[in-house]
Amino acid sequence: MARFKHVARKLRLAAALKSNRAIPIWVSAKTRLRVRRGFSLRNWRRSKLKNI
């Protein structure tokens, strides 16, 4: 990827980075382990972002 990134692309990458984190511990405690992990966890090597 180029060193210079357009602002729109940089904002989309930042949003993808923020959405790629585990759920808080209190969520699984409050739902009594019905919710165990986020459904959209992404690894940089396994699955790539589309249209960014």
Swiss-Prot record:
Pfam families: Ribosomal_L39. InterPro entries: Ribosomal_eL39, Ribosomal_eL39_dom_sf. GO terms for biological process: translation. GO terms for molecular function: structural constituent of ribosome. GO terms for cellular component: ribonucleoprotein complex; ribosome. Keywords: Ribonucleoprotein, Ribosomal protein. Belongs to the eukaryotic ribosomal protein eL39 family. This is Large ribosomal subunit protein eL39. It comes from Desulfurococcus amylolyticus (strain DSM 18924 / JCM 16383 / VKM B-2413 / 1221n). The gene is rpl39e.
